[in-house]
A protein has these predicted regions:
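Glycine-rich ThDP/TPP pyrophosphate-binding loop and its adjacent helix/strand module
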Residues: 1-146
Length: 146
């Protein structure tokens, strides 16, 4: 999509959200190399970097780190941010929009389940649904944090 927009001289931007566990897949790096080769500065990838995937910690499954250095080696503009800081994320979006000549990746360091005591940093919640009582507790904890 980003390449098509570039060819069509479109001002549209493409946003791609990735999980850190996804970065263990080869096709992600093929796409990263292609995006850099074609200087797709209309492409912004955001990596949700919480170090957890369905099978556990990413470094125990198939360690994709250091993510920032890998993207730099592939020719990307790399920004790192606290993924829970909305103002900092918005600043990164603006910086990415103004960066020319290469795609940008924002590595958003996050905590899986942040703000919910029984979910925080727990890989088991990756593909699980809370029951009714857990939903009520989670909503209560989130509302209290606001």
């Amino acid at each position: 999509m980003a390449l098509g927009n570039k060819i069509d001289n479109s001002s549209n931007r493409v946003y791609c959200l990735l999980g850190d566990g996804e970065l263990e897949e080869g096709q992600v790096w093929e796409a990263a190399m292609c995006a850099s080769h074609y200087k797709l500065d209309n492409l912004l990838a955001i990596v949700d970097f919480n170090s957890l995937q369905i099978d556990g910690n990413i470094t125990d499954v198939m360690n994709p780190t250091p993510i920032d250095e890998k993207f730099k080696a592939f020719g990307w503009n790399v920004l790192t941010v606290d993924g829970h800081d909305i103002d900092a994320l918005l600043d990164c979006y603006e910086e990415a929009k103004n960066f020319k000549g290469a795609p940008t990746v924002i590595i958003a360091r996050t905590i899986k389940g942040k703000g919910v005591s029984f979910m925080e940093n727990q890989a088991g919640w990756h593909g699980a649904a809370p029951n009714k009582e857990q939903v009520e507790l989670a909503l209560k904890e989130i509302e209290e944090a606001l």
